[in-house]
UniProtKB/Swiss-Prot annotation:
It is found in: Secreted, Cell wall; Endoplasmic reticulum; Cell junction, Plasmodesma; Plastid, Chloroplast. A- repeats lie at residues 32-39, 40-47. SMART domains: AAI. Residues 32-76 are annotated as: Disordered. Residues 34-49 are annotated as: 2 X 8 AA tandem repeats A of P-S-P-K-P-K-P-V. One of its GO terms (cellular component) is chloroplast outer membrane. This is pEARLI1-like lipid transfer protein 1. Its main location: secreted. Disruption phenotype: Reduced cutin accumulation due to lower cutin biosynthesis. Early flowering in long-day conditions. Compromised pathogen-induced (e.g. Pseudomonas syringae pv. tomato DC3000 and PmaDG3) glycerol-3-phosphate- (G3P) and azelaic acid-(AA) dependent systemic acquired resistance (SAR). Increased tendencies in cellular damage after freezing treatment. It comes from Arabidopsis thaliana.
Length: 161
């Protein structure tokens, strides 16, 4: 039995010496490698604010203000959208006994209500020439009829061109 115990002790010491030798042999006295520094995130570019608006200095030559239209100053264009004048087709149709719906001279006349006679004639002439009304008629006669229905007069010498 003593030989078993001594054999066990000899094996125990042999293994201890082996492990001690291995640990001493692998110790190289090296410093541990330093931890890598984290890569800094890119800094956002500073936002450039637009420069404050400079106070406007009036120019020495201000733009002329267009004077408001007076009853005698007519231009060559209609201040009303010609497509809106399509309601005047019902007025002409009812006068010619063509039933396209309920005739309403009120709608047509209300469109040209605030215009002088020349402007009203220009607007209706534009609508007739563009055939917005959808009826092929003699333009001077149709123009005169539409103006008369709305209690307007065809200006003397006016040519629907």
């Amino acid at each position: 039995m003593a030989s078993k115990n001594s054999a066990s002790l000899a094996l125990f010491f042999a293994l201890n010496i082996l492990f001690f030798t291995l640990t001493v042999a692998t110790n190289c006295n090296c410093k541990p490698s330093p931890k890598p520094k984290p890569v800094p995130s890119p800094k956002p570019k500073p936002v450039q604010c637009p420069p404050p608006p400079r106070p406007s200095v009036p120019s020495p030559n201000p733009r002329p203000v267009t004077p408001p239209r007076t009853p005698g100053s007519s231009g060559n264009s209609c201040p009303i959208d010609a497509l809106k004048l399509g309601v005047c087709a019902n007025v002409l149709s009812s006068l010619l006994n063509i039933q396209l719906g309920q005739p309403s001279s009120q709608q047509c006349c209300s469109l040209i209500q605030g215009l002088v006679d020349v402007d009203a004639a220009i607007c209706l002439c534009t609508a007739l020439r563009a055939n917005v009304l959808g009826i092929n008629l003699n333009v001077p006669i149709s123009l005169s009829v539409l103006l008369n229905v709305c209690n307007r007069k065809l200006p003397s010498g006016f040519q629907c061109a």
